[in-house]
Amino acid sequence: MKRILLLPALSMILLCSCTRTIYVVRHAEKIGATDSLAKMMANDLPLSEAGKVRAIVLKEQLSGQHIKWIYSTNTSRTINTADPLSKSINVSIGIYRNIDSLVSVIRSEKGNVLVVGHSNTVDDIVNKLTGQTKIAADLKDYEYDNLFIVKLRGKKAFFRQRKYGYPSNP
């Protein structure tokens, strides 16, 4: 009788240990293009005050999620979105340049992952991870509050979307 009960319990443990969760977000709010600093920095806009708050909220949301890897593009707004969580859990931020390479690396690693991207890359990352079109188009310019969650279990991918922080306004 003990063996019969032990087998299902063991299979559940093995199944759970093979599931990985990838959290994908767009960088938090950046300073507006009308700001004089934005004009000087053109392509590498820093986070606004609202963006700094959202980055802290992201840290609070994901601190207990056993993140082992964090990836960001090489811009200050993506790095600074990931930075509070990175410091909190002592996981360094890896820089990615190519989405296909990033997805390949994520699929080969063990552990949960945070990826910080841009309005025009988040959809591509999620869709390539799931192997399906889960996000049909680039995010809107004002969308900063989406937390996309991809669970990988063997060759299967499961997707859901949550909101975090204050709602984004158009």
Predicted regions mapped to residue ranges:
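Generic secondary-structure transition motif, activating predominantly at the C-termini of alpha-helices
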Residues: 9, 130-133
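Bacterial Sec-dependent N-terminal signal peptides
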Residues: 1-21
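Active-site-proximal alpha-helix that buttresses catalytic centers in soluble enzyme cores
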Residues: 19-108, 122-123, 132-147, 152-170
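A glycine-rich beta-strand to alpha-helix segment
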Residues: 109-129
